[in-house]
From Swiss-Prot:
This is Hemoglobin subunit alpha. CDD domains: Hb-alpha-like. PANTHER family: HEMOGLOBIN FAMILY MEMBER, HEMOGLOBIN SUBUNIT ALPHA. InterPro entries: Globin, Globin-like_sf, Globin/Proto, Hemoglobin_a-typ, Hemoglobin_oxygen_transport, Hemoglobin_pi. The modification N6-acetyllysine is found at residue 17.
Amino acid sequence: MVLSAADKTNVKAAWSKVGGHAGEFGAEALERMFLGFPTTKTYFPHFDLSHGSAQVKAHGKKVGDALTLAVGHLDDLPGALSNLSDLHAHKLRVDPVNFKLLSHCLLSTLAVHLPNDFTPAVHASLDKFLSSVSTVLTSKYR
């Protein structure tokens, strides 16, 4: 999915509001995903998936860091996320549908924490961005 100039502006502006909370929001989105879509827990059998666990927080930080990297490379998502794509496709073998589920949970988390900034236009831009990230992360499955 191609991000327009307006989408890129919206994504960068929204992510700037996330600031140093990317890891916290990533962890919250993971918790939402585990609660709303329990089958996603199968990829984390070695994790303590309870609320506030150190392992979920650590993985949430990885998610937040990856999204921060992606926001910084909106014009080259495939290059920026190539290593993560390899990891998820070849080593972890995550079912691609799970990226969509996590994206949904990330949007919900951002809407809760950024209510004044989460306009319909920003929502649409973030949705396109997360869809683009998901597409890149699943590109090496083929």
